[in-house]
């Protein structure tokens, strides 16, 4: 949750006001290929709601909003949970004729620097199928630690709400259907800018210029891992590692005064992440959540956005005088998520297979980050 709001904040530059509107163009949920999900959730059951419980189509900062997951179906009993997360930001670096955009994928989680990648204090970098993730070996312990950190911090991100789902247990989760809601208090634009300066130091100046356009897309890759036995803690693993013990305890008998200074904590966390799980560990669920959004400080842009999509105005009390009301007609019926996902996957595979073999980079790009305008130009008979 913390990651999502910080990523949205990354695109903020210098605005004239201390208010900000984030227009949610689309939120999509995809299953990972080759994974049989033991935890299922439908796209329409993943929503952002306001304090009155209404689904929101734009976010007004500052303000309180809740991430609402309904009808999470756990198909079988689970033991201990671990998780992996990777976040890729699609930065528009060039826009050509007919709206064709060439996007630069930038990995934000793990945080990418010129020489390396790194995760936070609770996770280590792992790689699978050419993609990097931050692995949290004890997901429930981390969730509580992060929530405590945010709730007690200066920005008070996690607000207390009577509708929030209490964290009652972190292991031996029974097969059932669950709902989950967590309230987030989004601060003002100036406060978010301060967070950017302290958190987004891995982004170079050129990419920051591109981000200031106010429109973007980012993908969140999530893997949930379950095992019969708990993971090894970071402290326990480091205490038993000859190469990393001095990172954990600089006063250990064989650690001299320089051992701690030359200790590579990121390498040690990566080593721990690769070995922390019990041999019974398996992937229980794998999803990609994709966010397409744009930002503005103009309320008239918000009204236009609502009209274009036939969305109701979730916060009518914020409507400015003499502004026409937004139509509340229902949106046209669209195919189910499963049908759209199956059709999209078939079209993607057919399009990539029809491309000439010399287009290696484009084929790889379209396989990972499907861009209909760009990819379909090279397979018009398919699209």
UniProtKB/Swiss-Prot annotation:
Residues 1-16 form the signal peptide. The keyword Membrane does not apply. It is found in: Secreted. Expressed in sheath and socket glial cells in both the amphid and phasmid ciliated sensory neurons (at protein level). Its main location: secreted. Keywords: Glycoprotein, Secreted, Signal. Glycans are attached at residue 64. Interacts with daf-6. This is Protein dyf-4. The lineage of its organism: Eukaryota, Metazoa, Ecdysozoa, Nematoda, Chromadorea. The gene is dyf-4.
